[in-house]
A protein has these predicted regions:
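Conserved hydrophobic/aromatic beta-strand scaffold that supports enzyme active sites
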Residues: 6, 47-49, 67, 92-94
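Short, conserved beta-strand element in jelly-roll/cupin
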Residues: 52, 62-77
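Short histidine-centered beta-strand/loop micro-motifs
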Residues: 17, 48-49, 57-62, 79, ...
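A short hydrophobic beta-strand segment most commonly corresponding to one strand
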Residues: 94, 107-117
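A short, N-terminal "cap"/entry segment at the start of jelly-roll beta-barrel domains
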Residues: 1-44
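Conserved short histidine dyad/triad with adjacent acidic residue
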Residues: 39, 43-62, 96-97
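Short acidic-glycine-tyrosine-enriched beta hairpin
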Residues: 81-98
């Protein structure tokens, strides 16, 4: 196994499909597709591509740190008590442990992510 992994967005394989947990759904009927590309250690560090259709959900990061780059689409993230922040293709951000707020997908979004638990 190589220690160098290239992300080939055209050959990501079959995604894991899911829906938000009912207690996290605020509006709409979003669906998710996740392509996990690589994991390290005991899955403490993971990376992949995630896609979501329009809707609003509660985002609770807990102890997870997540780095994201939006590949396509538009989202608005609002931390509880904070100002809404809009992100679209090319934007990069980090959700730190303890983040609690809303994730609103305005246009089907696809992001590249790295999560550390």
């Amino acid at each position: 196994m190589s220690n160098l992994i290239a992300f080939d967005l055209a050959a990501t394989g079959t995604p894991c499909e899911s829906k938000p947990a009912p207690d996290r759904l605020i509006a709409g009927d979003p669906s998710y597709r996740t392509w996990e590309i690589a994991a390290a250690g005991h899955k403490d560090i993971r990376t992949g591509i995630w896609e979501a259709t329009p809707g609003i959900t509660r985002s609770i990061k807990g102890e997870t740190w997540e780095y994201c780059t939006i590949l396509s689409g538009v989202v608005v993230l609002t931390e509880d008590g904070g100002t809404p922040r809009r992100f679209s293709a090319g934007d990069t951000f980090v959700l730190r442990p303890g983040f609690v707020g809303t994730w609103e997908t305005l246009e089907t979004v696809r992001k590249l992510w790295v999560a550390v638990s």
